[in-house]
Amino acid sequence: MRLKAEIPCPSFTLQYELSFTNMLNMLRLSGVPIKSCDRKELKNIVVAGGPCACNPEPIADFVDIFFIGEGEEVDLEVIELFRKCRAEGKSKQEFLELSSKIEGVYVPALYDVTYNEDGTIKSFTPKGDAPAKIHKRIMLDMDKSFYPDNFVVPLVEIVHDRAVQEIFRGCIRGCRFCQAGIIYRPVREKSPETINKQCRALCDNTGYDEVSLSSLSSSDYSQIVPLLDKLNEWSKDEKVSISLPSLRVDGFTDDIMNKIKTVRKSGLTFAPEAGSQRMRDVINKNVREDELLQTCTTAFAGGWTTVKLYFMIGLPTETMDDVAAIAGLGQSVVDAYYKCPEKPKGKSVRVTVSASSFVPKPFTPFQWEPQDTIPVLHEKQQHIKDSITTRKIQFNYHDADTSYLEAVFARGDRKLCKVMELACERGFHFDGWNDCFSLEKWLELFDECGVDPSFYANRHRSFDEILPWDHIDYGVTKDFLIRECKKAYADTTTPHCRLKCNNCGAAKYGKGVCFEKRKNMV
């Protein structure tokens, strides 16, 4: 199947750095020149957005327009401008210059980048009237956010084969490795009435019998219990199950448990992220081991026999003792099952321990930190394996090679564009799939282009270094990120936004939990 080359604005959502080659491959297959400078006319304007637009520089040569932030409104404004410019016979350059004046629009071609002798960025200079700082767009009233409730349901089975309903955007917690928890600040909730109406429409129009209430931390929705009550008024009779895929360890209560198992028990997944309390303090997870064990005991008493635990290895200051503690925490959950008098009779427990590799991301307190080398990550993965002593625990881990390439592109600059161009010419695609990925071939590309990938993945940055994304504003100040990074090295936690305003900068938007908390403190 080929794209049609006459599509006016081919647009891409970039959720994952290893999907960059897929975007270029789609353009190539459509007959559209992959480089922006080779597309001269006002057609085939390539647009991209999503989380990876936080650092657009590694693909700046290929994309005409990036949407910075949330796209529900800015996309309509750019489309309307595009129609107007075409009707008036304006050039592509004129359209791009006008687009750059829309808040949330970044046009890479309107900026020049210079570099120091050591390869770091020396300056980032806008051309003409292009803004020096690109500010993100934000949807302040989530009840007015467009949400599709009638769409084509795939004929084949897909990974997330269920209806998905966003209940709020942002996160109050502030985990120091988490990019989404920063770039989607402040927290903004949909009303229970809007959520209920949209969930009902989703099920009526698609035939799905499961609704997943989606957010970064669903149990942090301020009206979660009234919402579940409202949903259960119709979902129970219609045999529609409600799942909360993103649960805090300290947010899973008896009340919530009983409300989400009325039709069928969905899987339970918790993310302690680190095995030791010291490491959980470093990353500001603010979860204690006794809270996790109590939560799991509650689930076991409610009939659950399987639990998934998500962890991360390679975090700043991590030691091998911290790594071994991951296996130890998994064992403690197994022990909690057999100590629970109300556990299901005659059934065994299954605990899945999954460990991803830390990838430093832009706009996080750890954006200056190096990633562990691949051999060190392999050593830590093996250490967890060796520390597990029971068959009740299944251990899964992410491929360290793909995590390395992810780290390269997550914090890369425009010098990586020539690598991406060559990768497209050589047919690289589906790099997020192990059967299509070869780190050896990627390393050959880097070497051929004279680019050192470890410069991006394994190098510690100083706080005063100009970063490739410093010209972009996601609402949270660099001073706040620096403070949080320093607190991590002091093993010091920060309270969440509903307890205390930590002056991250997001209150400037004038809405959301951050603003309300700050207003009440003044």
Give the residues covered by each predicted segment.
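Glycine-rich beta-alpha loop elements in corrinoid/cobalamin-binding modules
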Residues: 2-125, 365-413, 421-435
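Conserved SAM/AdoMet-binding glycine-rich loop
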Residues: 9, 18, 201-352, 356, ...
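Flexible glycine/acidic-rich beta-alpha junction loops that bind and position SAM and/or redox cofactors
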Residues: 58, 112-116, 222, 252-256, ...
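Local cysteine-cluster metal-coordination motifs and their immediate loop/turn environment
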Residues: 166-182, 495-510
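Radical SAM enzyme core and accessory elements
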Residues: 389-522
